[in-house]
């Protein structure tokens, strides 16, 4: 096994931001997934002014990633530019792009692994799981000023994993049927052996020792093998939140980035006790609750030994970070999240409403593709 050294943590500007979105490539004929990623990227004439457009593990996916930004408005501008650039090139190739955490009806054995040593290694190592990993997430990077701060923030964000899952949930359909989940995507991620929560590590030194142990045991080659819900990213100088489904719009993706930035500031400003060891006992259950029930989840509190409605927790969270959002000049971006919680709306509900209207999932994907691409659509009203 060839291992890659962890390297030093590259300090970043406090609360700087970056966003990655994994997007679906769909056929304009039947809106099933298509296999055009390599050809699309090969024909792309783009100067990377807004960030990167790159391959993901299968030919039915494409990833866009913003430039590092100091503001949420900068993230919004990059995502809009990336989306518009990709849309223009996709239209020339008769391909649609679409958000959502899962494609509602694709058949995973039909997926083709993208060329590249890492992708091939993943396929050889994990077999069919690599093709089933054709799911689509949003990752948010938050800049940290030191390595120890990054580890503390990784642990602190872990408590809020259910909040980000519920607010981003957009994967109710799997294999052509309603999964009854709000976010079914994370079930595909959970199959990998190094998924889940970061262990209770208290410093960068403890993290480097833990990672060296995993390498020595032959478990991990590089930090990319850690599919944790939240993980440090030393080469970027960030903490990366990895549990969000790809939303149906770039506006929603931007709102989630605003919450991550505001929450990071609030956490580092107030330094609440983390109770990391106790939280570890309930993390998996709380994650399931958020995936299955979304805003209706009941979250277990290992400190007060009770359960709390996630909807109330979300409302309290959005209120708690409001001062920090104002200081970061991103308060307006939190308004859609507050409205979604208050009205019990979201992308999963929108997708189910479209399926209920049409009675088929092809038209659901067609409308979802329009929604991501920013085209006028009579069905873009909020769904209760």
Swiss-Prot record:
Catalysis: reaction(s): L-cysteine + L-glutamate + ATP = gamma-L-glutamyl-L-cysteine + ADP + phosphate + H(+)
UniProt keyword annotations, A-Z: ATP-binding, Ligase, Nucleotide-binding
InterPro entries: GCL_type2/YbdK_subfam (IPR050141), GCS2 (IPR006336), Gln_synth/guanido_kin_cat_dom (IPR014746), YbdK (IPR011793)
This protein's record includes keyword Ligase: yes
SUPFAM superfamilies: Glutamine synthetase/guanido kinase
GO MF: ATP binding; glutamate-cysteine ligase activity
Record Pfam families: GCS2
Top-level taxon of origin: Bacteria
Enzyme kind, highest EC tier: ligase
ATP-binding is among the record's keywords: yes
Coiled coil: none
Any GO BP annotation: modified amino acid biosynthetic process
Enzyme Commission no: 6.3.2.2
Stated family: Belongs to the glutamate--cysteine ligase type 2 family. YbdK subfamily.
NCBIfam families in alphabetical order: gshA_cyan_rel, PRK13516.1
Function noted in UniProt: ATP-dependent carboxylate-amine ligase which exhibits weak glutamate--cysteine ligase activity.
Official protein name in the record: Putative glutamate--cysteine ligase 2
Species for this entry: Dechloromonas aromatica (strain RCB)
Record lineage: Bacteria, Pseudomonadati, Pseudomonadota, Betaproteobacteria, Rhodocyclales
